[in-house]
Amino acid sequence: MDGIISNGSPGAPVTQPPPEPLERPPTPPPPPPEDSAAPPPPPDTSVPPPPPEDAPPAPPPEKKKKVGWGAKRPAATPLSVEELVRKKREADAAAAKPKFLSKAERERIALEKRAKEVEAGRRLKLDPFTDGTDRSGTQSPSVYPETPNGDERSIPTGPRAMRNSEVPTGPAAMRNKTYDMSPPPPPKAMSFSLTDGKGDSKRQAEEDEAAAQAALIKQKYMGTEKTSSFSAKKKRKRTTDRKFNFEWNAEEDTSGDYNPLYQQRHEANFYGRGRLAGFGDDVADTLAQKYARALEDRDREAGSIRAREILEMERRRREESTRNQLDKHWSEKKLEHMRERDWRIFKEDFNISTKGGSVPNPMRSWEESGLPKRLLELVDQVGYKEPTPIQRAAIPIALQSRDLIGVAVTGSGKTASFLLPLLVYISELPRIDEFEWRKNDGPYAIVLAPTRELAQQIEIEARKFTQPLGFNVVSIVGGHSFEEQAYSLRNGAEIIIATPGRLVDCIERRLLVLSQCCYVIMDEADRMIDLGFEEPVNKILDALPVTNEKPDTEEAENSAAMRSHRYRQTMMYTATMPSAVERIARKYLRRPAIVTIGSAGEAVDTVEQRVEMIAGEDKRKKRLADILSSGEFRPPIIVFVNIKRNCDAIAREIKQMGFSSVTLHGSKTQEQREAALASVRNGSTDVLVATDLAGRGIDVPDVSLVVNFNMANSIESYTHRIGRTGRAGKSGVAITFLGNEDADVMYDLKQMLMKSPISRVPEELRKHEAAQSKPNRGLAKKSDDSSGFGTKSGWQ
C-alpha cells in the first residue's frame, strides 16, 4: 500500500519481489533394501554429449502469463437476446434429434453406470460412522454444545482434499446444523442387462401375478391350509364397550306409586256399539256386554230384546272376522268362508290335482256335493261315510256336464264317482219304459269294462242305487248266451254295463242299438287297450249318434252352455295314461277336465310292499307255507301266478298246507269264475290263486295279503295286483318273490318301493345290476310266457 501511495498512481500495478520459498522438511531416507533384493546399479557419472550442430535452434521461451487476482481480464460483453434464443433453439434441435449409440457404447455406458452403483454401495456399506461419529472414532461435531450465540461451531479437520473424499452436504457454515439432510438412500440392485429399470419392474409384477394365480389355484383344489386358525363358525366375542349396564332394576321404578295416571287406566265410555280401535276381541265382547246391560237397565222389555240382538250380532262378527277365519282349518269353516288358500291346502291334503279350463272346487262332504236329496239318502244307506279323493274331485265336475279323464290308483272308489253323476243325468230324462219305441232305441248310458268280473262288480254296485230309483241295469258279458241277454233287454234298460267284445257282437247281431245313448263311461281304459280292445272300443264309440256330440270349442268348458242342451257326456277312468288311451281321449272327448289323484301309475300308499329274492319253485312254496301258517294274515288271501297251468299246482300245495283254495284263470267258464269269486267273498274259501285276470277291477273285500308267487311282466300289472289289498282306505300287505328272470322290471320296482313311504327296498334288490338302470328294450316279455299261454290273451 505504501508503494501505491508514493508513486501517486494508485491504479498502476506495482511489481513486488517474489516470496521466499518455504523450507520443506528433508526427505526421509529410503528404507534399507531387503537382503534378497539385488543391489541397485551405480549412478551414471558420464557427461551427456553436446547437441548436434544441425539441430534447429530452440524456440524462445514463451512469456509466462500472469495468473491471479492481479491478472488482466478481457472485458465481458453481455449476450444479446437474439443470441440466447438462437442457442436455445440449437440446443433444443440437438436434443430432439435421435442420438445413435453403438452397441459398444451402450455396453460401456451400462458398465460405467453399474460400476458407479457398486462403488456407491460399497462405500455406504464400509462407512460405519453414520450414527454421528467421524472416521477417526471421535464424536461428530454436531453433538458439541452450542455456542452462546446459538450456532454450532465445527472443528476444522484439515483441507477438503484430505477429508477422505467426503461428499459435501452444503455450505461449510451450515454443514453441522441439526437440520442437515439425511444421507441418500442406497441404490437398488441392478442386473448387468442392457434393459432399463422399467423392464425389471414389469417382469417382477408379472411374476407376482403368476404366483398369486398359482396360490389361488392351489387353494381351490387343495383346500385352505389346515394350520389356519380362522373359522367361519367360530363365535366372535362381541365388544362390550357400547353395552350399557344399568345399575337399577325395573322393580325399583317408583313412578307408578304416586302418579294416579299409572294406578288406574282411563276408560272411554261410548254409548252404543262404537269402540276404540286397536283392541282385541275380548275388549269388544266386554264393551258389547256392558252396552247390552245398559239397554236392559233402561228398558226392561224392548231393551232386553235389543240387547240379545246386539250380542248375536257381535258373535257373528267375531266368527266371520278375517283373523279368526285365517286361524281356522278348512274343515271348521263354512263353504262361503273358504278362500283360495283353503282350497289349495284342501287339494294338497288329498293329493288332488286338476287341470282343463275352469274346474269347480272339490266337495268337502256329501252334503256339499250338490246331489239330490234322494241320492244323498241312498249314499247314507249304502254306507259311504266320507267321499274318497277321486269322488271329491270328479263328482262336481261331472255334475257340470263336462267330459272327464280320471287318473287314480286302484281301489280309490272310482265306481261311485261315475255312477252318481250318471244317475243324476238320466233322472232328468223321460223314463225309458214309457213308450215302446223308446225301449227299442237302446240305453241312455253304457259302461265299458275290460273283464267280465269287473263288469259284474259294477252291476252289483249300481243296483244299490238304481233299484230304489226304478232304473233298469243290464250287464252284457261273455260266458252267457245271446238269448239270455236278449231276454234281459226285452223291457229296455237305462244303463248297460258290458265288455267291449260282447257289446260289439250284440251291435252286429242287431240285438242292440245306441240311437239315444248320451252318456259313455270307460272304466279301466288302459286295461282295455292292453287286452287288445282298442278296435272294439272305436267301433262302439263310432256307433254313437252324432246329433248330441259336443262342439270342440271353448263352449265345451262352459257348464251353463252344456246344461242348456243335452250333449253327450264322456268319462274315462284309468290308472295309467299310455299313448293309445291318449289317442282315444283326443278323438272322442271334448275339452275334458283332467283329475289326477296322486301320480299316474303309483301304488296305493296304504299297501306295504315287501320284496324277497327267492329263486326256484320249491323254495318259494316253502316260503309261502311259512307265510300262511304264521297267523299274521287273516283270509281272504290272493296268490298271483303268471301262467294258468301253475294255478292248479299252487292250489293243491295250499290245500296240503291245510287251507282252502280256489283258482281263477282264463280256462274257467263264466259260472266257475262267478262261483270262485262268490266263495272268496262270503268267506268259505281262504286263498284265491289267480292269473292277471283277477288283477284288475276284482273287488274282494278285506283282502289282507297279496302274494306275487311270480313277479308280473310289467310294473303296471304289478300295480294292479297289489291294488287288490288296501282298498277303500284300509291297510294291506303285498309280498313279492323275485328272481333273476325278473330283471326287466327290477329298476321300476325299485323306484316304486323308494316312492312308497311305508315300504323298504331290500339290499339284494338295491345292489342288483339290473336295478341300476332302466332296460333299453322296454317292457319285453319273458321267455317263460312264450309257450302259447300268453298272459294278455284270452287263454288266461
Swiss-Prot record:
SMART domains, alphabetized: DEXDc (SM00487), HELICc (SM00490)
Region of interest (Disordered), residue spans: 1-81, 113-211, 760-796
Coarse class of the protein's main subcellular location: cytoplasm
EC number: 3.6.4.13
Disulfide bonds: none
CDD domains the UniProt entry points to: DEADc_DDX23 (cd17945), SF2_C_DEAD (cd18787)
Positions in coiled-coil regions: none
Gene Ontology molecular function, alphabetical: ATP binding; ATP hydrolysis activity; mRNA binding; RNA helicase activity
Biased composition (Pro residues): 15-60
GO cellular component, one term: cytoplasm
Record protein name field: Pre-mRNA-splicing ATP-dependent RNA helicase prp28
Record's compositionally biased regions (Polar residues): 786-796
Domain Helicase C-terminal stretches: 606-769
Domain Helicase ATP-binding: 395-595
Annotated catalysed reactions: ATP + H2O = ADP + phosphate + H(+)
Subcellular location: Cytoplasm; Nucleus
Family note: Belongs to the DEAD box helicase family. DDX23/PRP28 subfamily.
Signal peptide region: none
Known role: ATP-dependent RNA helicase involved in mRNA splicing. May destabilize the U1/5'-splice site duplex to permit an effective competition for the 5'-splice site by the U6 snRNA, resulting in the switch between U1 and U6 at the 5'-splice site. May also act to unwind the U4/U6 base-pairing interaction in the U4/U6/U5 snRNP, facilitating the first covalent step of splicing.
